Amino acid sequence: MEQLFVVRLRELGALDRFWTSGRAECIPVTGRRRVGKTFLLEQFAVGKRVIYYRCQLKGTAEQLPQLGAQVAALSGDPVLLAQPPATWPALFAALERLSRGGRLLLVLDELPYWVTRDESLPSLLQNWWDEQGRTLDLMLVLCGSAVQMMDRLLTGPAPL
């Protein structure tokens, strides 16, 4: 048990270095189920401006408004709260505005669930990251237990 705790401290330290790097970061967190990825990320998120979204086995039409509602809640912007971002361009614009207010952590936990229902998601995220996300004061964490799928997302023909 003590050894596992030490490993987690090392992982937290690595995440902290990415957090304080002063630049945009896109960080994959992968591993088998039940090894503590979510717990690690929840601990890391404490005290940070964070949007922590747990992906589901649902399509984008259902999940994007849920993610948009979390973005709106963090922003506190009455306009966004009244009409949370429900399209990718609106969500990305809201993330850009939020990042101007200080370092922002966006965690997409169990991303393979969402990708299973929307295969276009990796290319959409990659295009946004390449064109805009990498310029923001943002740390994007892509987490998943489906190790093979995460490997394809990160090392395939168009890696994130």
Language model segments and positions:
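Phosphate-binding site recognition
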Residues: M1-L160
